[in-house]
Amino acid sequence: MNAIVFKNVKKQLGDFVLDIPHLEIKKGYITGFVGENGAGKTTTIKLLLGMLLPDSGKIEIDGVDVTTHGAEIKKKIGYVGDPTGYPAESKLKDIKRMYAPFYETWDESLFESYTKRFSLKLEAKYGQLSTGQKKQFALVMALAHKPSLIILDEPTSGLDPVVRQEILDVLMEHMQDEEVSVFYSTHITSDIEKAGDYLVYIKNGKIQINQPLNELLENYCIVSGPKNLFTQEIKKELLGYRESKFGVEGLVKSRALAEEIFGREVKYAASSIEDIMVFLSNKGGER
């Protein structure tokens, strides 16, 4: 079963075109969603939330069409974005009182548990909260109605490492107790490496990668060596590369393939999500 499915989806906004012929997001996992600014992450999320409609194609959440069943879909989604838009003068308890009745699945004990976990004072006004506390409260509100899909859009951006880790801990603990899927858009790739199960990478409106994260990090590899080893034919085998006066660094999809090509003549290093993004955005050039 899939949490999210895109089928032949296109959306044009000015000169930008989002083009996703097929995308499946597995149910019950945390899927990291990464890409450069302007790659299409925000457009994708707005389509999922029903804030935009596709020009063509179909989007499903838990097998239900987002376009034709918008009200039903919104009850299935917990959303944490940046910024969160609760009224600044409202107390947290009043915000909860306003929103809870919209959800038949609202769990008051879960709400109380998470607000205590984050030491949030319900008498406090939303506008008085720090950036970190606002993100924590938004996460509590998203989790308390027990959605089947949680969409996170930069939930830890601008937060210190301690608060970021607290948010990740609560998210992962919640997933152990509830049947839920997470679609996690962020530029903080280390958070995805800590918590993610799958990675989706988007570039220029097109999906470039969608695969298990552990498989990706185990297989993708950085090779580095003198320029004379990297002929034009070999460069074609690289997913991306960078040249400098010291030589060439390149990204390969498989260390086994790289060893067949280079043997012991180059250095090998494990790649991170950030490395993969940098090399895929740089198909060749100097630094």
Regions found by a protein language model. Give the residues of each.
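Conserved beta-strand
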Residues: 6-9, 16-26, 57
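Walker A (P-loop) phosphate-binding loop of ABC-type ATPase nucleotide-binding domains
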Residues: 36-40
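Helix-to-loop junction immediately C-terminal to a conserved catalytic motif
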Residues: 49
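Conserved ABC transporter NBD signature motif
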Residues: 57-68, 72-73
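ABC-family P-loop ATPase nucleotide-binding domains
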Residues: 75, 81-137
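Catalytic Walker B motif of ABC-type/P-loop ATPase nucleotide-binding domains
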Residues: 150-154
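ABC transporter nucleotide-binding domain
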Residues: 168-252
